[in-house]
Amino acid sequence: MIFMSTILIVNDDGINSVGLLALSQALKELGEIVIVAPECECSGIGKALSIGLIHVSSVEINGFKAYSISGTPADAYFIATNKILKRKPDIVAAGINLGPNLGLEDVLNSGTIGAALEAAIHGVPAVAISYCIRDIRRKNYVSIDELKVAMDVSRRVVKYILRNGMPNNVQILSINIPEKLSDVRVKITRVAHVGYCDIHCEADNGYRIVPWLIDNYRDAEPGTDVYAVKCENVISITPIRISLNGDCKDVELLVKDVFNT
């Protein structure tokens, strides 16, 4: 008996995103494809979960059976594993996000990576793939042909993980691919610890986020994801672990001093 791998595909750009279709086509030969995605865009929502009612609708995306939910990317993981599949997938592939996910702020804010985090928390290998448009105002004009490099990279990485497992001590791979690459060069990077600049502008008697530009990312050190994409124009592959534990040693000194223990 031949057992096919189950690949759960999610995103934060919504069920109708060309990036979701591109990723599904890229991975279709590697196993059973299950698509669960928000019914509308959820960019910047991180790992948020819905506390209200989540509706699920069965849809078809270019021949792929898919499920559209009125929830978040992290909800998509839970609905897929607990209600649709009723088991864990072999891998979660999140994307192809139309826009960058670079630096610590993006990692914590991204709905794409939020879904990957949810998978990783539950012991499922996860890959988050982002196509780094330099000007997010071009997002709705990206074609599937433009995503060919991102599709090829996604297929290669997911195929490796299904055969060999994740690299040791890695739970998520965040892959950022510069737009319109003429040659494929890859660097292993770390997450840049840089915060956003002033990202809000005045609008309608309030403030809204300005159009997202690669050039607006703060300068980061060589060896980071931001530097690789912004300055070197190469593909960045960033291994991520989700442990939130800090060093207890100095906290012991604090507790002894504050509580006289």
Describe the residue ranges of each PLM region.
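Short beta-strand segments
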Residues: 10, 36-38, 94-97, 128-130, ...
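Glycine-rich phosphate/pyrophosphate-binding loops
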Residues: 120-142
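Charged helix-capping and loop-helix junction motifs
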Residues: 107-114
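C-terminal accessory domains and tails appended to enzymatic cores
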Residues: 143-145, 164-261
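Short, glycine-rich nucleotide/cofactor-binding loops
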Residues: 9-16, 104-107
